[in-house]
Amino acid sequence: MNDSVKTSLKRTLVGRVVSNKMDKTVTVLIEHRVKHPIYGKYVVRSKKYHAHDEANTCNEGDLVEIQETRPVSKTKAWTVSRLVEAARVI
């Protein structure tokens, strides 16, 4: 009767890893553009999230996708779901 497939309703965001100094944790910077309500200019807003990285595979500069999850610790409620693009080494 009810053969529908469950879809994940968890939020996903894509951002850049700015710190991986903690064990099994990375800091991800998410940037988005918002139109200023009065002046109409597009302004870049940013926010940092702590995300759980179980295998310690992410490095600084990597582009990753994070997914909302249950709280892992006091400041972590996101987990790294996949690596979108590795950082380029110059």
Swiss-Prot record:
InterPro entries: NA-bd_OB-fold, Ribosomal_uS17, Ribosomal_uS17_bact/chlr, Ribosomal_uS17_CS
Record keyword Ribonucleoprotein present: yes
Subunit architecture: Part of the 30S ribosomal subunit.
Protein name listed in UniProt: Small ribosomal subunit protein uS17
Naturally occurring in which organism (per UniProt): Burkholderia vietnamiensis (strain G4 / LMG 22486) (Burkholderia cepacia (strain R1808))
Top-rank taxon: Bacteria
Keywords for the protein's UniProt record, in alphabetical order: Ribonucleoprotein, Ribosomal protein, RNA-binding, rRNA-binding
Keyword Secreted: no
Molecular function GO terms recorded: rRNA binding; structural constituent of ribosome
HAMAP family per record: Ribosomal_uS17_B (MF_01345_B)
This protein's encoding gene: rpsQ
Gene3D superfamilies, A to Z: Nucleic acid-binding proteins (2.40.50.140)
Gene Ontology cellular component terms for the protein in this record: cytosolic small ribosomal subunit
GO biological process: translation
Function: One of the primary rRNA binding proteins, it binds specifically to the 5'-end of 16S ribosomal RNA.
Family: Belongs to the universal ribosomal protein uS17 family.
